[in-house]
């Protein structure tokens, strides 16, 4: 199982996510990701990938794999905030320190 790490930005997004079904779906996808099963995920540049959850507004979680660690959870959002979220994820990945 791969170690998943979170940024503060992701934790804030997660705390604001009130839809219980959405939380369950995102949590299930992250669990599968930890076991190497990304499912519907696409690269968005700079080594960042977008995990797509087809529910509600189209939730997105951005992550980057570094060796045996996945820095998840750079940030999260939905289809409406996608462009801004991708830029935020790229910035957070560049700033990430172990």
Predicted regions and their residues:
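Flexible, active-site-adjacent loop/turn segments at secondary-structure boundaries
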Residues: 2, 15, 42, 46
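Local sequence-structure signature of Cys/Sec-based thiol-disulfide redox active-site neighborhoods
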Residues: 6
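Residue-level recognition of oxygen-bearing side chains
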Residues: 9
């Amino acid at each position: 199982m791969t170690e998943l790490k979170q940024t503060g930005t992701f934790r804030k997004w997660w705390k604001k996510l009130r839809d219980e079904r959405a939380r369950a779906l995102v949590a299930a996808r992250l669990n599968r990701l930890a076991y190497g099963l990304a499912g519907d995920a696409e690269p968005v540049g700079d080594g960042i990938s977008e995990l797509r959850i087809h529910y509600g507004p189209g939730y997105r979680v951005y992550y980057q794999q570094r060796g045996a660690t996945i820095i998840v959870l750079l940030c999260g959002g939905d289809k409406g905030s996608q462009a801004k979220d991708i830029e935020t994820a790229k910035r957070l990945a560049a700033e990430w320190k172990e």
